[in-house]
Amino acid sequence: MATTYEEFSAKLDRLDEEFNRKMQEQNAKFFADKPDESTLSPEMKEHYEKFERMIKEHTEKFNKKMHEHSEHFKQKFAELLEQQKAAQYPSK
């Protein structure tokens, strides 16, 4: 059974969404484990804030890169479908 572009695209979109959701869940678990701020020294509080910012930034960058890869794969899949179509039905 041949996969259509729409099926391929929808599957990549679902995978992107699922991965993003899992990353957000992992981040939420990590942030929930942070000690109560009232027990932290100013230096440790600053450390946690920087670390949280870094995690959020890296998560955003990673999700953006995953989306870019998915779009690239969709483009390549569309090109392969066109090549296959051209091979099956060559113009005269």
UniProtKB/Swiss-Prot annotation:
Family annotation (InterPro entries): KMP11 (IPR004132)
Pfam short name (any one): KMP11
Record GO biological process: cytoskeleton organization; defense response; positive regulation of cell population proliferation
Alphabetically ordered keywords of this record: Cytoplasm, Cytoskeleton, Microtubule
Chain ranges passing through the membrane: none
Subcellular location: Cytoplasm; Cytoplasm, Cytoskeleton
GO terms under cellular component: cytoplasm; microtubule; microtubule cytoskeleton
Family classification: Belongs to the KMP-11 family.
Role of this protein: May be involved in the regulation of the cytoskeleton through interaction with the subpellicular microtubules. May be involved in parasite mobility and attachment to the surface of the host cell. Behaves as a strong immunogen during infection.
Assembly, per entry: Monomer.
Protein name: Kinetoplastid membrane protein 11
